[in-house]
Amino acid sequence: MNLLIMGLPGAGKGTQAAKIVETFELIHISTGDMFRAAMANQTEMGVLAKSYIDKGDLVPDEVTNGIVKERLAQADIKEKGFLLDGYPRTIEQAHALDETLEALGLTLDGVINIEVDPASLIDRLSGRIINKKTGETFHKIFNPPVGDYKEEDFYQREDDKPETVKRRLDVNIAQGEPIIKHYRQAGIVRDIDGNKDISEVFADIKKVIENLK
């Protein structure tokens, strides 16, 4: 079973990916882990990636695609199957993944697409506030500070401000839509309502994956 999980920042993709991997005993392939492993093992692509990162440059697609190919070519992938998380990020990477899978004799069985209303994601992602004195982190909705606090006792990081969050989501939506469309044409996208409780979302995902088998 080879799967890809997609969803906007804050949609709970990381939480659900961990549950999928544990339940179905798949290999979790996340972009960050792949890069770290390739650089630590000094693979051909890992050395190349490090040369860009050390200079503060963006790693070009061909290097990212190469790192993915190196990982998918390892023996444990055919034995256990995988869950791809954080790749592909662009339609060009999606086409490269198609070619990689074909070259390695692998297929993508399903794309789990966690859908959450962007407006509620802005609330989720822009709710983080930090106490100016203690540095403690709270969330306006999920973990509000208890006690005699005033609004001016807290600050928000630039990254957490609603307008910054909205810009980030807009970029993710623009990049993600062509990828979803690409996989819809292949008939392998399964949409999941991510507005529900974590356990309910996973129950829906579990049903979908079991029906893919």
From Swiss-Prot:
Catalytic EC class: transferase
Annotated positions binding AMP: 31, 36, 57-59, 86-89, 93, 157, 168
Annotated coiled-coil segments of the chain: none
SUPFAM superfamilies reported in the protein's UniProt record: P-loop containing nucleoside triphosphate hydrolases (SSF52540)
Domain text: Consists of three domains, a large central CORE domain and two small peripheral domains, NMPbind and LID, which undergo movements during catalysis. The LID domain closes over the site of phosphoryl transfer upon ATP binding. Assembling and dissambling the active center during each catalytic cycle provides an effective means to prevent ATP hydrolysis.
Keywords: ATP-binding, Cytoplasm, Kinase, Nucleotide biosynthesis, Nucleotide-binding, Transferase
Pfam families: ADK
Membership in a protein family: Belongs to the adenylate kinase family.
Domain of life: Bacteria
Descriptive protein name: Adenylate kinase
Gene: adk
Subunit structure: Monomer.
Keyword Kinase: yes
Function noted in UniProt: Catalyzes the reversible transfer of the terminal phosphate group between ATP and AMP. Plays an important role in cellular energy homeostasis and in adenine nucleotide metabolism.
